[in-house]
């Protein structure tokens, strides 16, 4: 589970954009990526997630966390600190995947017939038994295809024009060949709503845990509470 933090004011936005494409190409359905926008001039921040970003003291954008365990990894580059621009984020992701998972979470979401509500159900199956009171679920809704002609994206990749970087990584080319301020971009995986992002939802996980026993939790999102949503048909639910 990757939380991708960005902003229309983040001049390194291209690194997060390209990183997401490459991760999806490599891992397919085995990776979940949600993108949290942040900043007073960004048109896409979700209120609760902005509060969460403040809570954790995020220092720069773009940025990522993996499973809320591997913190502040720069997208595309990851923890690599060498002098060359190398796609090494996969090394960090593979390291995170090697850690034994304590549970699996299956999530389903359904948009109501009147398009006003999304009902979400999470089924959690733990890999151990015991008494633990430190687990809780949080939920996010993301939207794909968000765009507006008035949105302006800061971009510093234009400074690499003439260095041949696009030959090494073709996905950077649209940004290298663009100007310092870009318009017409389409934003996917954007967090438009969340519940419990900061501390989890109290009571969503029973402290009495039995191996292979499925715990079920349900919540609803009233979409009128989230005005940044553009197209209710392009929403995805995660927990």
Where are these regions (language model features)?
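Short, conserved sequence motifs used for protein processing/export or organelle targeting and
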Residues: 32-239
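Local sequence-structure signature of Cys/Sec-based thiol-disulfide redox active-site neighborhoods
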Residues: 1-36
């Amino acid at each position: 589970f990757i939380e991708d933090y960005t902003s229309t004011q983040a001049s390194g936005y291209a690194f997060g954009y390209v990183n997401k494409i490459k991760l999806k190409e490599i891992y397919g359905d085995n990776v979940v990526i949600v993108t949290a926008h942040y900043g007073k001039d960004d048109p896409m921040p979700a209120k609760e997630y902005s509060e969460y970003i403040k809570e954790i003291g995020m220092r720069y954008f773009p940025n990522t966390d993996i499973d809320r365990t591997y913190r502040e990894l720069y997208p595309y580059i990851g923890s690599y600190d060498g002098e060359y621009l190398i796609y090494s984020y996969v090394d960090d992701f593979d390291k995170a995947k090697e850690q034994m998972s304590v549970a699996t979470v299956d999530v389903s979401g359904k948009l109501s017939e009147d398009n006003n509500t999304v009902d979400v159900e999470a089924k959690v199956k733990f890999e151990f038994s015991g008494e633990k009171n430190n687990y809780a679920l949080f939920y996010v809704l993301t939207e794909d295809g968000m765009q507006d002609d008035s949105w302006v994206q800061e971009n510093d990749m234009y400074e690499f024009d003439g260095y041949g970087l696009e030959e090494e990584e073709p996905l950077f080319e649209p940004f290298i060949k663009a100007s310092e301020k870009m318009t017409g971009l389409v934003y996917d995986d954007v967090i438009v709503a969340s519940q419990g992002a900061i501390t989890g939802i109290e009571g969503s996980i029973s402290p009495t845990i039995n191996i292979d026993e499925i715990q079920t939790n349900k919540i609803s999102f009233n979409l009128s509470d989230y005005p940044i949503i553009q197209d209710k048909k392009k929403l995805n639910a995660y927990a």
